[in-house]
């Protein structure tokens, strides 16, 4: 039950820019600075959207360090520290803490399909190794396992477990988790399209892919609903819905990078086995950005 009051609002799941086969530090730092200037409430480097599966561990650590250094304490940084190897997750989490991260995001172990008890011990081992908050990342569509509400409740008894990034897209989970763990258990939506409904059910914020492209709009939506102004939130959502759909027509990180390319902020290079979006999807993304008022 870690201190978790600051984890509210719109947290951008940052893309990782590449240039000439390497991570582009200058472009990444520029992205971080722009995001903060646009009013985002927090940053999440090297998660799924940051292409963590195709980063080396050295690259992963450098991106975390650059993000923390560039943020300079202006917004919280929740560093990705997930792995399907508990030992690797611990190593990444320990590094993130030493680098100055405010919290770590730890995904449910993917591919090896652990039991609920196995997942409990995975998170407990990370919990016991560090002294900063841990946000559980529950994403059954990618991990093939779903951390149950009951297991989350057990984990919330540990000192550093602060909440969940819930990418189930099942809004009912928000109410079930709120009932089981109470309102202090931080619930961050991991789905842009359902984030407004997620907040209405008791959520605290969103870890957003679309915020890469529309940071000010995403932050404004979250700020409005956190104040109970759902009319304003819905009006902003109406502007963003086509963009939510467009960015995820193909892998979301590729869609986000294409949107950032259209804004002139970075190249859309991704690492295999992912590819840049196709021209038809690129047109849909552009049209959606025009609808949102991001492009003329």
From Swiss-Prot:
Pfam families: DHDPS
GO BP annotations, alphabetical order: diaminopimelate biosynthetic process; lysine biosynthetic process via diaminopimelate
Keywords: Amino-acid biosynthesis, Cytoplasm, Diaminopimelate biosynthesis, Lyase, Lysine biosynthesis, Schiff base
EC id: 4.3.3.7
Localization per Swiss-Prot or TrEMBL: Cytoplasm
GO cellular component terms attached to this protein's record: cytosol
Active-site residues per Swiss-Prot or TrEMBL entry: 137, 165
UniProt catalytic activity: L-aspartate 4-semialdehyde + pyruvate = (2S,4S)-4-hydroxy-2,3,4,5-tetrahydrodipicolinate + H2O + H(+)
MF (Gene Ontology): 4-hydroxy-tetrahydrodipicolinate synthase activity
HAMAP family according to UniProt: DapA
Protein name, UniProt field: 4-hydroxy-tetrahydrodipicolinate synthase
Source organism (scientific name): Nitrobacter hamburgensis (strain DSM 10229 / NCIMB 13809 / X14)
GN (gene name): dapA
